[in-house]
Amino acid sequence: MRTLGELDYLLGVSDETRLGAMRFRRVGEDIFQAPDRGVPPVVELGRLLQVTERLLRDEETDEDLRLIFAPGSSLGGARPKASVIDQHDHLSIAKFPKDNDEYSIETWEEVALRLAERAGIETPHHELVQIAGKAVLLSRRFDRRGTARTPFLSAMSMLGARDGERGSYPELADALAAHGARARADAEQLYLRVVFSVLISNVDDHLRNHGFLWQGSDGWILSPAYDLNPTPVDMKARVLATNIDLDEATCSVDLLESASGFFGLQLSVARKIIRGVAEVTKTWRDVAREVGSREAEIRRMESAFEHDDLEKALSVG
């Protein structure tokens, strides 16, 4: 039996849901490689949720596998998810809960997305829906404009890094300076996102969780922010997965200030950003209640938001 290589996995992804603008077809053929079954509509969310639950219990049927894998997904990740077509006919990602989750990961990602928007961070169109009493997060694909496809590049690919390599935000700022269509504005936006990650303890900010969109001959721009997940300190220490400066990733307002020059920012501007983001993130409880989070979960998540860095950030400038 032949061992599958990287090309096999690349070609095994559905053309309809393939990330970015890469498409493949056989020499001499006009039709792009695609499965016989299309992406399910959003009305299938209940069924998809049941399928993911059976998959996680190793109780899936052949029909379950056909439903959830036929459209394919090139997005990866450790959480259960599926591609769906939303009510406005847009390709979207549905993120599902796990039975053993200590708290609703999807609900708190919605909280983070709302806070991010209010802090001035660009996010995808998103919606939290309840299916059979469980929260499912819908996130619209930002590499699609109708039927048009926008080339996408992860930060890992942009830096030529490999899995397990930390990388750093200054390196991403350098990449924007070299290849960016709006380098100065995106460097500031990138800094804003680093500050936000520090203040909400978004510690899974690895290089696959940042991306760039191609703007033709102008170059690349930052994609909308995605996979924003506040994490309580008892689950993971407040250390980012990507370095804040060239060497250090520990969440710290002092480190944010000292690293600001890498993003082309004067310290006064950086402090204004830090204070502004803190004024937003301090409202996290109100936003959590907006989305229907239970009080027990709000208490469970407190350490992700309430820490010395928040107090310090509110006092800078």
Question: Which residues does each PLM region occupy?
Answer:
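Phosphate/dinucleotide-binding and metal-coordinating scaffold of catalytic cores
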Residues: M1-L207, G211-G317
